[in-house]
Amino acid sequence: MNTPRTAVRTNCEICAGPGELWLEKGRRRLVRCTACGFTWIPEGVVHTPRGLSIYEDESLNFYAQYTDYYRDESAVDAARAKADWVSRFVPSGARLLDVGANVGAFVKCASEQFDAVGIEPNPGAVAWAREHMHASVEIGSIFDEVEAYVGRFDAVTMFDVIEHVDEPTAALRQCRRYLAADGMLFVTTPDIGSVCSRLLGRAWYYVDLEQHVSLFSLANLTRLLASQGFEIVDRRTFGRRYRFSYIEQRLKDLSHQSALLRVVHALSVPLRLAPAWYVPINFGDVIGIAARARPAGV
């Protein structure tokens, strides 16, 4: 599977409004719509010399380095929390498709309640999901046209995926095609309209010019979903538990970006005394939206 490069996007994906330069590093730019606030990288997803996106071309070794992170109980807890959220709106035994399944933690947890399968463009991640998570994950992308999927699923999930997609409208349209009548879509993504994002500005930790090519606010993502035939039924934020060692290291990595983050990192150094301890964190800057597919023509 080879994801084609898309044309450089000069206008907003959501409202077609003009964009203004917000951040530039090397040949990568981050542009924000002056009308609705949608923020994107015009150059789209990074491609490797072989013409593959970075999500298709990563090796299995990349995932092997993060074995402990992916199998950590907090990662599984986060996946199970999402599965429980889905279960509030979708009956047990329903057919579920997880888009961008990564190493299969959510598919594994969802399989306890649903007939769940995942698609993931990275062969290394798929191999890891099968070997370590024993999850039903296939190599594939939401942009692949799979006729057998049309109208098949009672639920489609896109957890921490849409920010990596440079054609989010097309991705949501395909999700809608794969849903059965009255099916449910579940999306989580960083909220660039959140208080935390506004406080940190360009130093916000979800500003990533390599990977996060589409950044939404709650308002403009709701607008995009409505335009693709979805009715919002639930909104919430998501956090998770993190090891002290992970928090301290992440703050160290980010501390060069702003004076505020340098101060926060300095205050976090005592976390090294108990690296294996966990703390729950929810800054309110990761949104979750549950949306029901409206009947055609409504």
Residue ranges and their predicted role:
Residues 1-159, 169-173, 237-238, 249, ...:
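Conserved N-terminal segment of class I S-adenosyl-L-methionine
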Residues 160, 164:
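A short His-aromatic
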Residues 169-184:
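A short glycine-rich, Lys/Arg-flanked "PGG" loop and its adjoining helix->strand segment in the class I
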Residues 114, 230-231:
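A generic structural motif
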Residues 259-285:
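A transmembrane-helix-recognition feature enriched in membrane-embedded lipid enzymes
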Residues 187-214, 219-225, 246-252:
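Short, glycine-/aromatic-enriched active-site segment of Class I SAM-dependent methyltransferases
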